[in-house]
């Protein structure tokens, strides 16, 4: 079907190399344009960020996926989601990009919808992401249906696409003061009441 956006996984060595090349370009162009930004150095260092992501990609359960958005015979963007089926079915969108030449005319929204449908077919019940505090990204994800959802353990703002269906939940006692889930809850509360978030 012409103009239909599909998702294809980068599986071959060549596809994975292209994926990481595009991800590095995205980080330099869109996320960390300041070449002196310490975060940029971390995300472009294959011994740090890539090695960490590769470990998540290679595990048997709750893994991440290197994906391309594909339309009319060419890749038009990419995504890096992780689906936690052993937990509560969360799809965490680590990275999402529509290549600049293909932005506009609702392409980003269509890619986001395709990604969320793809994730649902693989067991995702809801989605979450970090939008980095960028107002443009905040507006985009709100149009997709996400709502602001506190902050992560590093104080970065999160967004949540609530589940369409009821999600079973469990209760457990979190006793470790360094537990990331406690930090996330505390940061979400502090952010809501206008206080500085806790950082590691």
Residues of each region from the PLM?
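Short, charged/polar, Gly/Pro-enriched secondary-structure boundary elements
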Residues: 164-170
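Conserved acyl-CoA
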Residues: 110-126
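A short, internal acetyl-CoA/4′-phosphopantetheine-binding micro-motif in the GNAT/acyltransferase core
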Residues: 95-104, 131-132
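Short loop/turn motifs at secondary-structure junctions
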Residues: 92, 123-125, 145
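Acetyl-CoA-dependent GNAT
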Residues: 5-89, 94, 99, 112, ...
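Conserved beta-strand-loop-alpha-helix junction that forms the acyl-donor binding cleft
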Residues: 128-138, 155-156
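Conserved acetyl-CoA-binding loop of GNAT-fold acetyltransferases
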Residues: 142-151
